[in-house]
Design a protein with these regions (language model features):
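Terminal, non-globular segments
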Residues: 1-173
Length: 173
């Protein structure tokens, strides 16, 4: 039941991401993304290969439904997915993966969750903005876009992490 609930939330958030990219493009110096936190909050029982397939499908759906270069979101999202477990281990410690706990900002701490979200979003945006610019934008414009997008996307992603990773289990197993 939990995975069904997570699947519905994931698809609704993917649709919200597509709507934001299509209809709320305020300035060319801002890219709002919630895809990295969606990947970060996948269950830890999900294998790396299944996570990569989910990331590829999510990126493909976002690229296909958004008026932009096809493959750009896939290019940026797959490395985030590939580095998800090492990132979680680096931020939360290896005991999270050893115990088989799920990611939860309430149980593991909102500060640590914000650090993990910021790191995954930074990796996504670094690849996305660099590939999107492709040498056509000056470095200052790319840096401003990266900083503004990282700040806004990380702030938006923290409540989304609470939505995707509810603390429904006991504190300790």
């Amino acid at each position: 039941m939990r995975h069904w609930n997570l699947s519905v939330k994931y698809l609704l958030l993917l649709a919200a991401q597509v709507l934001v990219w299509n209809y709320f493009n305020f300035t060319p110096l801002l890219t709002v993304t919630i895809l990295p936190v969606m990947i970060l909050c996948l269950p830890l029982g999900c294998s790396v290969s299944m996570s990569l397939v989910i990331a590829f499908a999510s990126g493909f759906a976002a690229d296909f439904l958004v008026a932009g270069p096809t493959g750009l979101t896939i290019l940026a999202l797959v490395p985030v997915t590939f580095l998800r477990r090492p990132l979680l281990s680096m931020v939360f410690g290896s005991e999270l993966l050893a115990r088989g706990d799920e990611v939860s900002s309430r149980r593991l701490g909102r500060t640590k969750m914000l650090i993990a979200i910021t790191l995954s979003t930074a990796l996504f945006l670094l690849i996305y903005i660099t590939a999107d610019s492709a040498g056509t934008s000056p470095l200052w414009a790319m840096a401003v876009k990266f900083a503004a997008s990282l700040a806004l996307s990380s702030a938006i992603s923290l409540p989304i992490a609470d939505l995707l990773c509810p603390d429904t289990e006991a504190r300790w197993k």
